[in-house]
């Protein structure tokens, strides 16, 4: 009967020959999942792209839809300009 040391050396040698990973304690490493091809691009192409409100308005070429987020942004911007916190005059050109 072969000793444990000889069997371990045989396992190390066979893993080098066949290109497999040698694990002395037989633990799970998850290598099978790490080596697999990533599926992110396939899954992403399956679902349609999300479209936001601004893109919808440009697709429909209709400016009658009120965009509350844009209006709020412009309101805040005008308030900051009134307070003197807007862009400098050299940048407004």
From Swiss-Prot:
Protein's UniProt keywords contain Ribonucleoprotein: yes
Single annotated GO MF: structural constituent of ribosome
One Gene Ontology term, aspect cellular component: mitochondrion
GO biological process: mitochondrial translation
Alphabetized InterPro entries for the sequence: Ribosomal_mS33
Alphabetically ordered keywords of this record: Mitochondrion, Ribonucleoprotein, Ribosomal protein
Transmembrane region(s): none
Main localization (coarse): mitochondrion
Source superkingdom: Eukaryota
Family to which the UniProt record says this protein belongs: Belongs to the mitochondrion-specific ribosomal protein mS33 family.
Subunit and interaction comment: Component of the mitochondrial small ribosomal subunit (mt-SSU). Mature yeast 74S mitochondrial ribosomes consist of a small (37S) and a large (54S) subunit. The 37S small subunit contains a 15S ribosomal RNA (15S mt-rRNA) and at least 32 different proteins. The 54S large subunit contains a 21S rRNA (21S mt-rRNA) and at least 45 different proteins.
Protein name in UniProt: Small ribosomal subunit protein mS33
């Amino acid at each position: 009967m072969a000793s444990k040391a000889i069997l371990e050396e045989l396992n190390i040698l066979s893993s080098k020959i066949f290109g497999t990973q040698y694990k002395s304690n037989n633990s799970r490493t998850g290598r099978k999942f790490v080596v697999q091809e990533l599926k992110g691009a396939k899954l992403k192409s399956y679902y349609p792209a999300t479209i936001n409100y601004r893109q919808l308005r440009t697709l429909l070429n209709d400016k009658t839809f009120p965009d509350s987020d844009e209006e709020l942004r412009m309101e805040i911007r005008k308030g900051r300009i009134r307070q003197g916190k807007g862009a400098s005059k050299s940048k407004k050109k």
